[in-house]
Amino acid sequence: MVFTPSKEQEPAINDRQKDILVSASAGSGKTAVLVERVIQLMETGLSKDAKPSERPNIDDILMVTFTTDAAKNMRDRIRRRLVGATDEHMKAQVARLALANISTIHSFCEQLIKRYYYVIDLDPQFRLIDDAEQQLLKEQAWQATLDDWVANPDQVGALHQLIDNFGAGNLESVVQALDTEADAQPHPSDWLAGLSGLYQFEEGADPRQSAFFKRLLEPLVGPQLKELRDQWAALGEVGPARFAEQVEEDLAKLATTVDDQGHLLGSWDSLAQTLNKKNFAPKLRKRKDDDDPELLDELGVQRGGLRDQLGDLHDTYFFQSAADLVKYGQKAGALIEILTRVATDFRCHYQIIKQDRRLLDFSDLEHYAYAILTGENINPKVTWSDEEARAKRQAAAQVQAELQRHYKEIMIDEYQDTNRLQDDLLRLLHKSGQNHRFMVGDMKQSIYRFRQADPTLFKDYYDQFSADGQSSEALDLSDNYRSRHEVTDLVNLIFEQLMDQQLGEMVYDDKASLKPKADWGADRDQASPATPELLLFDGGVKKTTANPTGEDAIVVRQPEDKVASEVWLIGQRIRELLAKETILDPETKRVRPITPGDIAILSRAKRIHSVIAEQFAKLNLPVMVHGVENYFKATEIRVVMSLLKVIDNPYQDVPLAAVLRSPLIQVAPEVAAKFGLSQGENRIGFTEPELAYLKVNSTSKDFFGVVQQNYYAWRDQEVEAVENHDALTEEELAERVAGDPAGLATKEELGVNCGLIYLKLARFFELRDHLRRVAQRRPLVDLIWTIYQATGYLDYVGGMSGGPQRQANLHALYERASGYEESGFKGLYQFIHFIEQMQKKNDDLGEATTALAGDAINVMTIHKSKGLQFPIVFLVETTHQFQADRDPVTIEPQAGLGFTYVDSTANETMRVKHPLVQQAALKEKKKRQDRAEEMRLLYVALTRAEQRLFITGYVKDADLTKKMDKWNRAFDSASPLLTTTTRLKGQSMLDWIMMTLVRTANFPTLREGVEAAATPLRGLTKAAYQIKLQNADQVQAALNTPLDLHPNATAEQATPAAATSRQFKADLERVLNFTYPDQVATQTTAFQAVSTVREAFARQDPTNLEMGRLEIDRDQIKEAGAYLAPEERAFENPAFITGASDQEPTGTAIGTATHLVFQKLPLTEPLDEGAVRALIKSLTESGLIDNPQVAAGIDVAGVVSFYQTGLGQVITAHPEQVHREVPFSMLLSAHDLFSGIGATDDSEVLIHGIIDGYVQHDDQIDLFDYKTDRISQAHPEEDLQELADKYSGQLVLYADALTKMTGVPLEKIHRHLYFTRAKRVVTLSAPPSSHEPKEEA
């Protein structure tokens, strides 16, 4: 589809020769604008009067994105725009696209380091480490730091001061927090050294003159005090004369504290005295002559609230005299200087450990790249002389100048998530008058402050560029092409009342508000109503109805906890959507039923995800969970970790019980059947009665002793009772144990089968002993992979709910164990200890990522949803309270560090805690920053919705009345913007949402007495919405009520209630109990690989080939190797008989390796011999190619030549449509396939194979197959013809399989063979009705 920019977008695409910042609201098409600007720069040049020869190439433009996926998306979009270009310059860009710098900031820095490492004397042979490995190394660095300080008599006393103040346990976390913040600064050491500045005061000067007061305290307190003063003045305007006089007195006092601009007045001590609420008279007493005593009483209450707020300001910030502020500030400053010295030493140790092992973390990439451009020495092991330092700075200046000349424009996406180091780094690539910056972002979507992103950078640039307008400009994109107006109206209504500079760090004005521009077509009013819904589960109403009974009941128990209750409410609404309602298809804009893949559930935290997965499984709602509360709490990880603990030390009761109860211990179905059990009955894991039986039949105190005693007692008893005990199998032993009358009463009481218990015990000890041998002899990663293979657990979890995510988690555990060992750490015990330490710190290694599910409801955090959009969005758990700051220190990168000072010198037996004003001010600043982040998270969540928006929460009856009082505080403001105090009182997203809705005309009465306290406020954005409260009875009844489908619903979209109907159960039993009627056929040769029968396809009648039918005899089949009966098989003699050498690589091995190279080659990068050789080296080092002689036998030139052919060019032009190594299986009639060999009419042959590759484009498919056959130099054409005939039938089957897989007609599938040795493409069909091979050089 051709992109046509709007008038709003045109300046962002066409403006030249200036730095540009684009503030692009959600859904404004910023990616399309970025791509179009790149295309226009290459088409028209860097200036309006640029000559054709001056136009830049794609690799002259630096494009920095926030994520790897975003970079890939950008590259793909540019490629699609370039393909088909007619201009020679633009056509040339297709080939140059592989050279383009389109990457994340870290990838760009890595390229820079690998190219210019010599500037800073860095070893170029480094390896990047992940978060887990980083944490291990930091543990070592911290221990080394402590050892140094303890060993130094001059420092050990200072270390004790830190431990006295922060505690031994907290000190490490404080230092590591400082280290993390320092990493985001251009000059970490300078930043650390400046932290004590917040506590420095000039001798004899009032604290009001300090940097602390001017930079931190006044910006916080001044505006808030002015807001209080204004509210105070408004009270005096409506009250009686006596009250007005009191207010006048109050205002006279306040006038000495703050001016109209929010600047504080007077000295520190005068402010402390005036702001004390005791300085303001209490509430007026009623008098008989009062005209309106009720009004006076109400006004008195409001004034009392303002008086209390004033008192809070005093008690929070002005509780100390100026003298005490200076005194304790100096003591705290001295302690911070010690702390920063420890932090600096820690960073030095950590850096040395990494350099000794040639390791880099992600922050190193940025710092080393920055050093390359500045010539700074950041290597603690190297000291430069003055001459060396000067030479390094000159070399850095040359690199910087070279890059500035090379990059004609620097484009940065998601600039709001940039930190100060990244900002400085990118500015070094810019030179005024030589190149320009194009920065795109949206401060309203900056949600990564916890990763040291600084959204104020974007705001500063926006203000600066807006004021300039000449050499730079700021542009706004607020037109929304994503969402229906019902969604954007609600978003505007909420944020015009919530977001401003004081609490939100920006103003939500007309430039920031969303303007709906999405075209939903002519059917836009035919879909179900798109009014946003606020769904609240009322947990205060007790459940009164009995649980339903009968086979058709879905919900037979209502969960008591609020999280599960809210999930039932969500499930109920989704169930209704799937059964009854429609949306507009995002692509066709036609009305269609809603499918699970249309729905996304977004949450602030992961804690609700596991509950959703569990409860939705009961509702038969398909779900894909992207992220659980904690990686190590995922069931599959806990099971494997329990097994690792048991392998290390079996005398651990909880891990042992977890293993025994898990699917790791299984009895084969056919064995279980011999004990009268069905295939699924009690054969997977030990049941609770079985474990209880083991316990009561043992005298051991520890659980492993219980298990051992039962197993060996049974085994020894039964083995001794049999003469030929060597021939006794475990199954026979189990049968004897099952008949053993010992413990019969207990068996009958517990309902267990001793034979089955014995088999499970035997399986456990067999598995444990095998894995212990592996653990003793092989690396940790081999042990973990052996667990997966020996137990089949990796496959087992794949069949569970959220299977792909669970499998990804297990693969990630393997990878993390690999990283653990690569860091030099060894041993199972140490690995387990490391994991336990991570868990104690509430740290997490991060869950493995999975792709979005197209056929299931996607569940993810708001952070995960950034950059995505969905037709229907549920924002859930909005009543979850904002987190309070409980850290021992408060760090604000631009302000400083706050903590509580502990004085242990004043009294030998007592430690005195002194709260510091700096700590209070930093906590308040941090709180506001956190609230601003929560506000932006709410914005991101709401703007993911295209058509339907649902907001859910949980409230209780008693809490609802209290909450309504809080929400009604919105009426304290007579303007659309809520007061800062009101917004700060909001403890959850739901609080904020309800505060913004309560002043609208359509706010309903939630319950009797629970309603808006005043008349609606005029001037607010008009937005439709619904608020629904439902209790347990209502939700349960709805879930158990069968739903009538809308006329367009398919069977797959039927109500999930049908999933539990009698018919479904009958169908399920029929499937589970199904007996395959042709079991014997599975033991024949009806399973054939395409490669084993391809000879049978040679020189066939083309008509028969098209029909999938062959006329061949038995000898031909035998020659092809597809034997019909076991007695006719003739296997080749093994190498030890024939004497064949296993040193020389076979043609098959080389062919397999060549196919692997074709499969792994990145199609978006330059495909030359260097790239191929580098890939072969990588595959060899990783063990995928395990024989160097095989690697040497790969025809590198033959691989490269393929991509220089016409077919190869088609492939590289459509990399996203290329599919490689595609497996398939299909059933063909044996009678049709092998006519003439006596196959019965009802026999079928399962053909399986792997298609080397195909590319689907322009409604057709090019199917290609690589061949490494030898070609005679004397008769190459004859050989090619013969080989083409030989393989033609094989490609007919491939084409037939592709037709069934893709739906593309056979006549539109072109078949090609590529012979690597001849470097030739032979086209067998174009279309398949033409059977004359066509050759292409």
From Swiss-Prot:
InterPro entries assigned? AddA, DNA_helicase_UvrD-like_C, DNA_helicase_UvrD/REP, P-loop_NTPase, PDDEXK-like_dom_sf, PDDEXK_AddAB-type, Restrct_endonuc-II-like, UvrD-like_ATP-bd
Tell me which residues make up the UvrD-like helicase C-terminal domain. 522-867
- How far does the signal peptide extend, from start to end residue? none
Q: Where is the UvrD-like helicase ATP-binding domain?
A: 3-484
GO CC annotations on file? cytosol; DNA helicase complex
Return one Gene Ontology term, BP aspect. Answer: double-strand break repair via homologous recombination
Q: Which cofactor does it need?
A: Mg(2+)
Enzymatic reactions: Couples ATP hydrolysis with the unwinding of duplex DNA by translocating in the 3'-5' direction; ATP + H2O = ADP + phosphate + H(+)
Q: Give a GO molecular function annotation for the protein.
A: 3'-5' DNA helicase activity
Among the Pfam families in the record, one is UvrD-helicase
- Binding residues for ATP: 24-31
- Record keywords, A-Z: ATP-binding, DNA damage, DNA repair, DNA-binding, Exonuclease, Helicase, Hydrolase, Isomerase, Nuclease, Nucleotide-binding
Matches recorded under Gene3D superfamilies: 3.90.320.10, 6.10.250.2380, P-loop containing nucleotide triphosphate hydrolases, PCRA, domain 4
- Supply the EC number(s): 3.1.-.-, 5.6.2.4
State what this protein does.
The heterodimer acts as both an ATP-dependent DNA helicase and an ATP-dependent, dual-direction single-stranded exonuclease. Recognizes the chi site generating a DNA molecule suitable for the initiation of homologous recombination. The AddA nuclease domain is required for chi fragment generation; this subunit has the helicase and 3' -> 5' nuclease activities.
Q: How does it assemble?
A: Heterodimer of AddA and AddB/RexB.
Similarity annotation = Belongs to the helicase family. AddA subfamily.
Q: What is this protein called?
A: ATP-dependent helicase/nuclease subunit A
